[in-house]
Amino acid sequence: MKTYVAHLSNFNLSDGIYYSSKDNYKSINKFSGLKEFENLDHKDTLIVLLPSMLVGSFPFKSNEKLSQQVNLANFISDIDSDIPSEVSQNEFLIYKNNGFVVNKKHYKSLNNDLSQLRCKILLFPDYFINLEHGKNRITELNESFLFSYENGTGTSVDKNS
């Protein structure tokens, strides 16, 4: 069983760099497209770090007495005036005490590409790499600064912007 951590590039969701448990995550490997991961099997895990600048994150406490659909509707209602695009252009997700907003076109394209692989896939915003609830953290990774906040939200900015 091998684990790979792929950090997608800022704007091209099919390119980036990855690290592998084969060498204890020491080597930086570039990839272009997902062909690099086609040989992974069901025992392997691919952790995909999506650039946080492409993911809106908001604190949101789900009500365990309500269904997932009702919680999602409540989340959308809470934040719809805070997002710059139309609600219908986005995908909304809830994880633990946070809600996430991702451009639907990017999300579906990435999901379609990743579903071709045979391994277990975990998709996270890149700021999760150094997330610790209750603490604010700034991390430099590749050409980005990652900001993780004490409430579990975060973002990233390109070093050159």
Predicted segments — roles?
Residues 1-161:
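Hydrophobic/aromatic-enriched cytosolic interaction surfaces used to assemble or bind macromolecules
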